[in-house]
Curated annotation (Swiss-Prot):
It comes from Phytophthora infestans (strain T30-4). It is found in: Secreted; Host nucleus. The keyword Signal applies. The keyword Transferase does not apply. The RxLR-dEER motif acts to carry the protein into the host cell cytoplasm through binding to cell surface phosphatidylinositol-3-phosphate. It comes from the Eukaryota. Keywords: Host nucleus, Secreted, Signal, Virulence. A motif (RxLR-dEER) lies at residues 52-71. This is RxLR effector protein SFI2. Effector that suppresses flg22-induced post-translational MAP kinase activation both tomato and Arabidopsis. The perception of highly conserved pathogen- or microbe-associated molecular patterns (PAMPs/MAMPs), such as flg22, triggers converging signaling pathways recruiting MAP kinase cascades and inducing transcriptional re-programming, yielding a generic antimicrobial response. Its main location: secreted. The gene is SFI2.
Amino acid sequence: MRSAFYIFLVVAVLARCSVVAAFTNADDSQLLSKVSPDFAANDMTYTVSRKRLLRVAGREDDDATTDEEDRGFTSIVDVIKRSDAAEALHKLSKASAKKVKKAGKAVKELTAKEKEALKALLALKDGN
């Protein structure tokens, strides 16, 4: 363990000496601050695309952002409602779950959300 520490110390001292020597020579220190022309050209080419990466195409009005912020709070309410519904589903017996399943099959027109709720109910009851 000590030998690793000593090796690290020697490398750090030698590296520090070479960096100090490079900065004392004025010509060497300027080499570190120069930018290659290829890198500068690439940087200027991609500047516009980097700025536009996080923007959504097609929305220029500010009303869309306020609507999105409002929806965030309603989704929290929806999550709470779903968790309450899940707790209620856990309390149902298998017989009442079968009745709900039969009622769901009897109704021909179920919305997508109702079908999803029915699948969740059946999955919860099959897990018990």
